[in-house]
């Protein structure tokens, strides 16, 4: 089972959404941020299931989304660039369903 510590190790913060009352994980970038949920829009807890990453600008306007096959696929992308770097944001954007 995935925990906040697993996500923190690869640079993600943890937050609770007041509307849905679920835990999401996210990462901040310059003028943008991304969030992670499972495919049902809930807290990701199963390392073998797909995860949805959604990107937003500073005004919380939706930019794009990607699907990661599983937690390992997300970890592999995170190892390619520093957390919160522009390079990592571009890698996330280009990494749909890998």
Question: Where are the model-predicted features located?
Answer:
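Intrinsic disorder/low-complexity signal
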Residues: 4-5, 13-14, 27, 37, ...
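Charge-rich, solvent-exposed alpha-helical interaction surfaces
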Residues: 6, 73, 77-80, 84-91
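Negatively charged, low-complexity tracts enriched in Asp/Glu with abundant Ser/Thr
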Residues: 1-31
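Assembly/interface hotspot detector across virion components, adhesins/toxins, and nucleic-acid enzymes
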Residues: 12-13, 66-68, 80
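Intrinsically disordered, low-complexity regulatory segments enriched in Ser/Thr/Pro
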Residues: 32-76
């Amino acid at each position: 089972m995935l925990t906040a510590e697993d996500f923190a190790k690869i640079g993600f913060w943890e937050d609770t959404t007041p509307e849905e009352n679920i835990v999401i994980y996210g990462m901040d970038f310059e003028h943008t941020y991304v969030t992670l949920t499972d495919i049902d829009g809930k807290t990701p807890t199963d390392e073998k299931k797909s995860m949805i990453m959604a990107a937003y600008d500073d005004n919380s306007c939706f930019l794009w989304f990607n699907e990661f096959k599983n937690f390992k696929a997300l970890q592999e992308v995170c190892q390619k660039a520093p957390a919160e770097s522009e390079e990592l944001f571009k890698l996330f954007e280009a990494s749909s369903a890998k």
